[in-house]
């Protein structure tokens, strides 16, 4: 048995990726029509051809057995923590969810142009109201209870909140907690940024501050870390 996913670019099928049961290196092959398109999505490493691409020499912890073209679409630390929380709510262990399934979980919500089908996990056909304070609190809980997620999210009333943060937080990339939102500057209303929002809304990448367990490789971020990042952003705008 294998896990198979279709890879799409701008609504067009460009190929498929598969991972055989018991193996840890995936195989990718371009769609026959796309192989003749002349659109090079990875010209240096995966030029258009009818060959099957596999990259067993790539770092397994980094690429999870995927070609670099596809691995770049995988969720990072925070996104994976959210997926693990969702798996716990489904009674599954994180290691039962392979790399191709994680691509399918990203589906069409990724930051780049690539999309993966069939989509897995909670999705929304219309925008829903989001309470940022609840997202921050839930992000802290996810990062603080990584070793006991199933018990943490078994409590009554957390399913909807978990679904909300899964819809906005798994695709943004990066190690630290963040979400893709739609914000209305006039009403200050925040909605999911994963689907088309109503008129008056703007799309933003929202970085959470004050989240417990929020870090990359070093110590946990102190409160106000986001303000420091913002200060660096302002400094970068200064022309000397």
What is each model feature region?
Residues 1-238:
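Phosphate/dinucleotide-binding and metal-coordinating scaffold of catalytic cores
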